[in-house]
Amino acid sequence: MSEKLPYKVADISLAAWGRKALDLAENEMPGLMRMREMYSASKPLKGARIAGCLHMTVETAVLIETLVALGAEVRWSSCNIFSTQDHAAAAIAKAGIPVYAWKGETDEEYLWCIEQTLYFKDGPLNMILDDGGDLTNLVHTKYPELLSGIRGISEETTTGVHNLYKMKANGILKVPAINVNDSVTKSKFDNLYGCRESLIDGIKRATDVMIAGKVAVVAGYGDVGKGCAQALRGFGARVIITEIDPINALQAAMEGYEVTTMDEACQEGNIFVTTTGCIDIILGRHFEQMKDDAIVCNIGHFDVEIDVKWLNENAVEKVNIKPQVDRYLLKNGHRIILLAEGRLVNLGCAMGHPSFVMSNSFTNQVLAQIELWTHPDKYPVGVHFLPKKLDEAVAEAHLGKLNVKLTKLTEKQAQYLGMSREGPFKPDHYRY
């Protein structure tokens, strides 16, 4: 396949700004810097041709340059049409790394961008780094001839992991995969603490709304929902949760949140956030009962949670306030403010998670790529986890930056607990 464009970004002149942002982020990403210190000399990813499909942000740029420092060739696209930070994409392009991403892609351009990452100068991809499963699905359905040459997939997010397990159950998955999302240092940090900061950032930048005193409805009380609920409560909102899982619902109730259905909550809320990864969470009948100027947004991976199609087909008027902020006038006279067209609000309307928490997630990604590339015999076709020892190592790499001092087990204590002084400190089934 002939290579057409070395990169495609919004504006290559933003590269200098992007480079400054990368320099700042590196100081907040100790895990990735540790990976460079440990592996830059040995280059364990030498020979790997990694196709990446993950939000093209400043933090992702630091991940990309880490993979390259470890010996990999990389081609990149974003996993969301609104999530690219154009200065970050420009910096990566300027560094000579093929990247195909800009903020505000069409669905057709989005697919085109992913397809540009499949073929390298020395041959097709042989590793996948995915976020949400679009790249994984594309190769399995449209380019199955490439599957035999792919050594492994590392998947970043809950939605993509769900997709992998579904593929495996249906006998469709043809490549070994590591579930990065369920590393403790990913899901209990990125999903929880990342969303706790970036949700509010997105809502504030989009609307400048006062959150204190408002009623906020959070659909879903997984790790993402927990972070969102904490953030909204911290800013003074009264928070209502909707849930399908009795365990999560009980957790929410015991944290003091009201738990009810969307059919009831839609009449009370001023701000709505979907976090479920499921379809049909907020539908036409809910919009029709909402208060005037209710703010509706999503922080789950895909744009399937909010019925945006219903709004577009049934609203009397749609007014674009500014990029990714639309105000719909309904037939009943009430208005709905929709953020980021129902896609990820924290990346569509703000800058996504802070660098420090993304360092946790991306260090897991680097370790997963090294594992799959250097130990292919250990990972048959299926969905695997990183070992507990590596999870603990990711956490340990971030402690110094926060001036955390760990207590060290004595030999006597270690013998009493029946474990090594060096860990792992918890069994695999421990839930944290």
Curated annotation (Swiss-Prot):
Residues with the N6-(2-hydroxyisobutyryl)lysine modification: 186
Residues engaged in binding substrate: 57, 131, 156, 186, 190
Cofactors named for this entry: NAD(+)
Enzymatic reactions: S-adenosyl-L-homocysteine + H2O = L-homocysteine + adenosine
Principal subcellular localisation of the protein: cytoplasm
EC number(s) reported in the record: 3.13.2.1
Pathway(s): Amino-acid biosynthesis; L-homocysteine biosynthesis; L-homocysteine from S-adenosyl-L-homocysteine: step 1/1
GO terms for MF: adenosylhomocysteinase activity; NAD binding
Cofactor mode of binding and number, as noted: Binds 1 NAD(+) per subunit.
Protein keywords: Acetylation, Copper, Cytoplasm, Endoplasmic reticulum, Hydrolase, Hydroxylation, NAD, Nucleus, One-carbon metabolism, Phosphoprotein
SMART domains: AdoHcyase, AdoHcyase_NAD
Entry keyword Acetylation: yes
Modified residues (Phosphoserine): 183
Subunit and partners: Homotetramer. Interaction with AHCYL1.
Protein name from the UniProt record: Adenosylhomocysteinase
Naturally occurring in which organism (per UniProt): Sus scrofa
